[in-house]
Design a protein with these regions (language model features):
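Conserved beta-ketoacyl condensing-enzyme motif
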Residues: 27-100, 106-107, 111-132, 285-307, ...
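Condensing-enzyme catalytic core mediating Claisen C-C bond formation in acyl metabolism
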Residues: 4-32, 141, 165, 176, ...
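Conserved catalytic cysteine-centered active-site region
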Residues: 63-114, 122-154, 193-219, 252-254, ...
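Beta-strand segments within the central parallel beta-sheet cores of soluble alpha/beta enzyme folds
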Residues: 51-61, 87-91, 115-120, 172-179, ...
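Long, well-ordered mid-to-C-terminal structural blocks that present hydrophobic/aromatic surfaces
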Residues: 262-299
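Short glycine/threonine-rich loop-to-helix capping motif typified by GTGT followed
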Residues: 64-71, 258-262, 295-317, 345, ...
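Active-site-proximal alpha-helical scaffold in enzymes
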Residues: 90-121, 153-188, 227-233, 342-365
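Short, well-ordered amphipathic alpha-helical segments that serve as non-catalytic structural scaffolds
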Residues: 32-48, 72, 99, 155-159, ...
């Protein structure tokens, strides 16, 4: 099997355009129209590349409610004016993170020069029971659902196990994640929950699944996101594009059921995906300037700090309390607001993370712009950890020198 480093030795791939819809509730939109808007915005940011330049597309969606599951990929690309071969990727919440990975593979291997990758989801028109069902199928459907377990309940088990294993951790640490991400989301014009919350707001909110409260859980969301992945030759031929190099991509799978895995206080697939991405990029956690991580529930962000190597096991609460992951900290995490405040349109989430990385690395983040970041990391998880993908982007276009850390 080709190693991550050998894969990195193939031709380079670049993200040269990225766009997304607002995330929220849009009863007058369809999954087709949302994705078309994201494609329009990605192409508008791509410095002269147009629909005629796209060789193929890879898209991700869960298909909440069962809408157009069989051919939703071609349905959205044809509606968006892209008559190209289209593949739909399914990996629960990691669907479009994997779509981006597949696009990178196609470009790096030489199978394509320009690939559009993205995702979409419409969730807010579904009833609560329908949403619970479709989130539940991201877990182990025969046994976890048989016991009445919900998606929130599964992560609550992880949260309780973390509190029991690491005595210094408290429920207030979950609330600190919410406070940070709501503050970031309040400044993001695309975010669903554009308001701040206090520690008391988060800790005293209604319990969803003990010990998780409402503010420890992401919302249900409609939205779409898309990015253009191109070869180094295409990037060099279009000097007006703002390019970020795909330095590394790592992916891993695991047993789908939480009860089938050896630990409740880590997501091994995230750890393995990160190791592969770091190896391919020839970099380390210390080189990462900012990250977008999969905070579907507050406990998931704390686990991500540890799974991605930002700190040792059990030290995530300390990292958070010390402000390291704040917007003005040493390692800002979820400056977009994360899934918690930006929103979690399942199939669009992974691509949306790449949109944020591209904006920050190319200076397109507006008032939210970080101070000269060079390396960004996106972390996207499917279910409770049955799949994970980690993508590392670096500042700099084809032929440009990317400064070292």
């Amino acid at each position: 099997m080709r190693s991550a480093r050998e894969a990195g030795a193939m031709r380079d791939a670049y993200v040269v355009g990225a766009g997304q819809t607002d995330f929220g509730s849009f009863p007058d939109e369809s999954y087709r129209s949302l994705f078309a808007t994201a494609v329009d915005r990605a192409l508008a940011s791509a410095g002269g590349l147009g629909r005629e330049d796209v060789d193929e597309a890879v898209v991700g969606t869960l298909g909440v409610g069962g809408r157009q599951l069989g051919l939703s990929g071609p349905a959205v690309t044809e509606f968006a004016g892209l008559s190209v071969p289209t593949t739909r990727v399914e990996n629960a919440c990691a669907a479009s993170g994997y779509a981006v990975r597949n696009a990178v593979q196609a470009v790096k291997s030489g199978m394509a020069d320009v690939v559009l990758a993205g995702g979409y989801e419409v969730m807010t028109d579904a009833s609560g029971d329908t949403t619970k069902y479709w989130l539940g199928v991201s877990g182990e459907t025969e046994w976890e659902r048989l016991t009445g377990a919900t998606f929130a309940g599964t992560y609550a088990q992880m949260a309780r196990a973390y509190l029991d294993e690491h005595g210094a951790a408290t429920v207030d640490d979950f609330s600190r994640v919410a406070v940070k991400n709501h503050a970031n989301g309040s400044e993001n014009p695309h975010a669903q929950l554009r308001f701040e919350c206090s520690l008391d707001d988060a800790s005293d909110a209604a319990t969803v699944a003990d010990p998780l409260t409402l503010y420890h859980c992401c919302p249900t969301t409609d939205g779409a996101a898309a990015v253009l992945v191109v070869s180094e030759e295409v990037a060099a031929d279009h000097p007006d594009t703002d390019a970020a190099r795909v330095a590394g991509v790592g992916a891993a799978s695991d047993r789908v059921g939480l009860f089938e895995r050896d630990t409740y206080t880590a997501i091994p697939a995230s750890e393995r995906a990160a190791e592969s991405a770091y190896e391919m990029a020839d970099t380390s956690p210390e080189d990462v300037d900012f990250a977008e991580v999969h905070d579907c529930f507050a406990i998931a962000e704390l686990l991500a700090y540890e799974d991605l190597g930002f700190c040792e096991r059990g030290e995530a609460p300390e990292l958070l309390r010390e402000g390291v992951t704040d917007r003005d900290g040493r390692l800002p995490v979820n400056v977009s607001g994360g899934l918690k405040a930006k929103g979690h349109p399942i199939g669009a989430t992974g691509a949306g993370q790449i949109v944020e990385l591209w904006k920050q690395l190319t200076g397109h983040a507006g008032d939210r712009q970080l101070d000269d970041p060079e390396v960004g990391l996106a972390h996207n998880v499917g279910g409770s950890g049955g799949a994970a993908v980690v993508t590392i982007l670096e500042e700099g276009g084809a032929g440009q020198e990317v400064s070292g850390k």
